[in-house]
A protein has these predicted regions:
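Long, acidic (Asp/Glu-rich), low-complexity accessory segments flanking structured domains
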Residues: 1-42, 49-81, 89-94, 116-183
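Short, solvent-exposed turn/loop segments enriched in Gly/Ser/Thr/Pro and often Arg
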Residues: 85
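A surface/extracellular/periplasmic glyco- and lipid-processing/surface-interacting theme
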Residues: 95-115
């Protein structure tokens, strides 16, 4: 099954300085519907609380407040899988409370969007799974693959092009996911 790594990184960053990080932080150019039409069935969504509300993020990059329309679209597609990450890299001051908020929010999403299979819920700072995944995810993207120093400078788009043909078996196997940049 094809999965998109950092699914929502096609969105525009909210802070001006984030534009300088696009070669390394942007992992998708296609919007949600185009990703789905290209065969993506597994979506990687990252959240963090910023100023008291949930935001779509990728590490330090803020894409703005969580828009529930995203989940409605995914639910309408039907038979899709979502991995939700609490993308807080460093351990917060009150980690247990933060995890409780995350799990409560996850429960809300699961109940509101029955067309989505929430397959994974990870708290980033401890990389701990809070759901039991049914699908084996093969990470095949810029942040996990070994690369030469000059490949790092070229960014995620170059690297996605370089590894585009890898993991074809996982894409054709419904029990596995090849998580890729720039699907």
């Amino acid at each position: 099954m094809l999965g998109s790594h950092n699914t929502l990184s096609y969105l525009r960053p909210k802070k001006w300085w984030a534009w300088f990080t696009i070669p390394w932080s942007k992992c998708q150019r296609k919007d949600l519907e185009k990703q789905y039409l290209c065969g993506v069935k597994y979506f990687d969504i990252r959240l963090r609380i910023i100023k008291g509300e949930w935001h779509f993020v990728h590490n330090k990059i803020d894409y703005g407040p969580e828009d529930l329309f995203i989940y409605q679209c995914l639910s309408d597609f039907g038979d899709v899988y979502v991995r939700i990450l609490l993308d807080q890299r460093e351990k917060p001051k009150y980690p247990e409370e933060y995890k409780e908020l995350f799990l409560s929010h996850l429960n809300f999403l699961v109940n509101c969007y029955p067309g989505i299979h929430f397959d994974s819920a990870i708290v980033f700072w401890e990389w701990k799974e809070y759901l039991t995944p049914q699908i084996n995810v093969v990470e095949n993207h810029f942040s996990v693959k070994p690369k030469k120093w000059w490949e790092y400078i070229l960014g995620t788009r170059y690297f996605a092009w370089k590894v585009r043909k890898e993991n074809q078996d996982e894409i054709n196997d419904p029990s596995m996911v090849a998580l890729k940049d720039f699907v």
